[in-house]
Amino acid sequence: MVVSFVSICGLLLIFNLPLSTSFPVLSDTDVDVLEAILHKLEESMSEETEEDQMVPANSESLEPVGSMKQTANRDQIRPVEVEAIREFLSANTRKNVQNDSSRRSSSCFGRRMDRIGSMSSLGCNTVGKYNPK
């Protein structure tokens, strides 16, 4: 009795083993459906590539995006614009020189600690606003 029960359980396990895998066995109808879908996809992709490859016959008559007049106008810079550019750049350089964050720090603690140290004479650079040397 025990042997027949074990053999029946073993046979059931063997028959159900393919169903428990992560890749189930497909029937013929499933394979046929997948092949039909694949053929439809290939046909639609080939039609799209043919449409993309078609070039219009009047491609020679098309004008370039930038005409010659536009490029010539871009190349000519008025003297007023040159002067404005120079003024802007000189203002930027003045701002960079005057700006505290753009100056290099010579202290051993960094900019913020240097400011605190100069006010309280606790940093490496003790020469400051309230503590003249």
UniProtKB/Swiss-Prot annotation:
Chain spans, region Disordered: 44-76, 93-112
Name of a matching Pfam family: ANP
Cysteines paired by S-S bonds: C108-C124
GO CC entries: cytoplasm; extracellular space
Intracellular or extracellular location(s): Secreted
Top-level lineage group: Eukaryota
UniProt GO molecular function: hormone activity; hormone receptor binding
Chain intervals with Acidic residues compositional bias: 44-53
Name used for this protein in its record: Brain natriuretic peptide
